[in-house]
Amino acid sequence: MKKNIVIVCLMLLSCFSYAQNERTETLVQSEAKGWEYELKAGVNIGGASPIPLPKEIRKIKGYNPKFNGSFEGTVTKWLTPKWGISASLRLEEKGMETDANVKNYGMEIIEQGNHVAGYWTGDVHTTYKSSFVTLPISLNYHLANRWKLRLGTFVSYRMDGNFSGYVTEGYLREGSPIGEKVSFTNGQIASYDFSNHLRHWHWGTLIGGSWQAFKHFNINAELTYGMNDIFKKDFKTITFDMYPIYMNIGFGYHF
């Protein structure tokens, strides 16, 4: 997926170079009627997190946002010189890597091919990565000649995803917080994989802004907040909801 987004971004740069020299009569007429078209590329920085952090997570020991590319096409209709509405189609990745120290954290490890569920106390390493097709819809406001603000909502469909990792330097209480103790110390690890429990459909809110750096070139920033858990409703191993929260930073070319 990452390779595909890089290829698309290179194609986008080629389109920019061509578009600087060629603007069709159709685009000129559309602009006169209040229509605006933009191609965007960016990077998502953030992660999936419970809000607020639950008592089970005692310490965040490490965080890596990874490279989460995005590519987007946007159509905007300006209803007045100040107000407009827009719809986009976005291909994007969202992910992160974290290291945390936890206590009585819901867990199902894989030990010698068997799944053992219970409550983990110790260190947890998590890798999360998903690819989405996203449809954002927003209300736009021209704050000044070069500044534009937007507020809206989005719906996303997850095409693929991974939520996995390992536990180490701690112990698992099987079944309950007072169950049989299984220890993993001195570098021993046990893996886990919750990828099959990831939800396909996501929705949420967005707020963002754009600055027109040049005649057709914009710098964009947008914060998205997912309103539903990244896991399916019937997944009970992790006892708290995890919400995708990401800041997208990038650039765009409007025709």
Task: Give the predicted meaning of each segment.
Residues 39-45, 87-93, 151-157, 221-225, ...:
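Transmembrane beta-barrel strands of outer-membrane/channel proteins
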Residues 35-37, 67-73, 133-137, 203-207, ...:
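Hydrophobic, lipid-facing positions within transmembrane beta-strands of outer-membrane proteins
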Residues 77-81, 141-145, 213-215, 255:
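Outer-membrane beta-barrel strand-turn architecture
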Residues 211-215, 243-255:
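Outer-membrane beta-barrel "beta-signal"
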Residues 20-76, 226, 254:
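Short glycine/proline- and aromatic-enriched beta-strand/turn motifs that initiate or cap beta-hairpins
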Residues 82-85, 146-149, 215-221:
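Repeated loop/turn-to-beta-strand initiation elements of outer-membrane beta-barrel proteins
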Residues 19-38, 81-82, 104, 163, ...:
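Outer-membrane beta-barrel biogenesis signature
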Residues 47-66, 94-131, 158-200, 229-246:
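Extracellular/periplasm-exposed beta-strand and loop segments of Gram-negative cell-envelope proteins
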